[in-house]
Amino acid sequence: MPKPAIKTAAKPATSSAGKRGKPNTPKSVAKPKTAKPKTASKPKVKPGEKKRLHPRNLHINGYDFPALMASYPKLKAFVRPTPYGALSIDFADPLAVKTLNAALLLHHYGLAFWDIPKGALCPPIPGRVDYLHYLADLLFEGGKVKRAAAIRALDIGTGANGVYAILGHQVYDWQFVASDINPQSLTNVQRIIDNNPSLQGHLSLRRQQDDKAVFKGIIQASDRFELTLCNPPFHGSLKEASEGSLRKVRNLQLNRGEQPKATSATLNFGGQAAELWCQGGEKQFLATMIRESQAFAEQCLWFTSLVSKQENLKPCYQALEKLGVDTVKTIEMQQGNKFTRVLAWSFHSQAKRLQWRNQIVSGT
């Protein structure tokens, strides 16, 4: 399948209305300034307005616990009525959350087996699949979103759960490379793949050997990806990560009218070290990712990452402008009381992006 011709990533857009040709600059004028990247974002949520999940998200109306228990009877042991007459689980109980995830992945996404080691990050499925739905919109740029087996995506820091790669394939038929620095995490994801025929041959795993690198050592010379995605570590130290986990558990208990308390047994938000924190936290991780992305610009159509902390966006924008990227987009998301956003950037013009995507989807 021939690939579209992509211009060298390091060449910035000129001031001539975004065209790649020679700018029409009068002789009396000094060198043209590099054009700022085109930016776009989703409308911000107004105060008091609740932003729902993505319209294609199967969980937009909450959990259907009777249906989930019918599909996955093990969930029954953890479901209980709430004071408001609904059914729910104790979201501060890691085993309950893990069992709910297994039920969701079986009932909605056809995954026969899913498990994670004790202490590994247990992700909320609705929020994870929301990111993927917005990436599909990003890739098709306002056009009709299609399932396409030719689309390749790279999941940076897949963790022991492998959820982004799993959901991306099950929902959109994308092919995934999933990377992680922790060999135990990759071993567990491989176990999930081995126990699900629908994943076999569609997910491949790569270990990151350098704890200071993001793309380097993972993206190979022959690779081409339509998307990269990442949920970066957001804490800067183990202490900070532990305090954040305890705070979330206490908030859950307060919301249920319970006396705040937390033990190691109740920390569903724990997660292994590489999943929750790194030196410099989210800000430094994003800075490294952006810096390294330039070297792989011709091989990747869109680079994306979740950004948990709003204040980390400004330095990202500044770094991307210095690199001369063509387009930067910020997509705001909300799951319950949690606000986050997707930062996306591409070194290619819209015309080049459409050419690339159309050749991939059409198979020409």
From Swiss-Prot:
Residues 33-53 have a biased composition (Basic residues). One of its GO terms (cellular component) is cytoplasm. Signal peptide: none annotated. Disulfide bonds: none annotated. It is found in: Cytoplasm. Keywords: Cytoplasm, Methyltransferase, rRNA processing, S-adenosyl-L-methionine, Transferase. GO terms for biological process: rRNA base methylation. Residues 1-17 have a biased composition (Low complexity). InterPro entries: METTL16/RlmF, rRNA_lsu_MeTfrase_F, SAM-dependent_MTases_sf. Residues 1-53 are annotated as: Disordered. NCBIfam families: PRK11727.1 (NF008725). This is Ribosomal RNA large subunit methyltransferase F. It comes from Shewanella sp. (strain MR-7). The gene is rlmF.
